[in-house]
Amino acid sequence: MPTLQGTFWCFTLNFSGDAPSLSFNERVQYACWQHERVSHDHLQGYIQMKKRSTLKMMKELLPGAHLEVSKGTPEEASDYAMKEETRVAGPWTYGELLKKGSNKRKLLDRYKENPEDMELEDPAKARRCRAKIDKEKFIAEFKVEDDEQEWKKILEKEIEKIASPRSILWVYGPQGGEGKTSKAKELITRGWFYTRGGKKDDVAYSYVEDPTRHVVFDIPRDMQEYCNYSLIEMLKDRIIISNKYEPITNCQVYNIHVIVMANFLPDVTKISEDRIKIIYC
């Protein structure tokens, strides 16, 4: 089953005794919440994440809370979370609420209205807008093929677990046609970062746009000799370094899953064997 994910979330956290205090990290754009009492005490709240987040990531952020992707506008959801009728204490807030009239949305609207003008005025922004629109279309229209293969079930069980700081999942299918690339595409629709490998600076530069993402490498058969094990380990180790255009070192606290889809087994002279968990197609 595809993983539930979203940017805007509503939550309810039941408790007894004193109301729990909440704290948030840099992944959160905005949060509001209050102590309510209907038949029992609970915290009712709304969270805007900076990037799309899975249900699992949200449960790590708010252990014990019931979470749902918000369906209304940001204003409606925050107003509901801070309604007076059932309030006992609060409300409390964190960060700044982003409304639907943000600059990012206006830029996309401008592109949709007249893409030709933007391509002439600012080709770089036009390319980013086109890429975002195409990705949204891909996510909406991508169809999962055979998702009942045994290796895919094993892989899903692994990525449902809390990511370890060390283990790398290596999906090995020597013949081709096992569905590795299709699975990698499906992971894109769930917010994963997709790459076919390459130069470390180039891949890291793309990744640091959102360095909280899980990563799937879809390595072509002809890249076996040039597989960049240093890049794979760098992303897994959560210290991301890129010297493309300007030196950037991005340090991350939270562990991620890293999957390598390949037609070949890992070269254990180039990567520690104990880091690799092989899943056979």
UniProtKB/Swiss-Prot annotation:
Binding of a divalent metal cation, residues: 36, 42, 85
Positions contributing to ATP binding: 173-181
One Gene Ontology MF term: metal ion binding
Record keyword Nucleotide-binding present: yes
Catalysed reactions, semicolon-separated: ATP + H2O = ADP + phosphate + H(+)
Keywords associated with the record: ATP-binding, Covalent protein-DNA linkage, DNA replication, DNA-binding, Endonuclease, Helicase, Host nucleus, Hydrolase, Metal-binding, Multifunctional enzyme, Nuclease, Nucleotide-binding, Nucleotidyltransferase, Transferase
Pfam families found in the cross-reference section: RNA_helicase, Viral_Rep
GO term, biological process aspect, one: DNA replication
Cellular component terms per the entry's GO annotation: host cell nucleus
Recorded superkingdom: Viruses
Motif interval(s): RCR-3: 80-83
Cofactor needs: Mg(2+); Mn(2+)
Annotated motif Nuclear localization signal, positions: 51-71, 97-103
Domain CRESS-DNA virus Rep endonuclease: 3-97
The family this protein is said to belong to: Belongs to the nanoviridea/circoviridae replication-associated protein family.
UniProt comment concerning the protein's domains: There are 3 rolling circle replication (RCR) motifs. RCR-2 is probably involved in metal coordination. RCR-3 is required for phosphodiester bond cleavage for initiation of RCR.
Protein name according to UniProt: Para-Rep C1
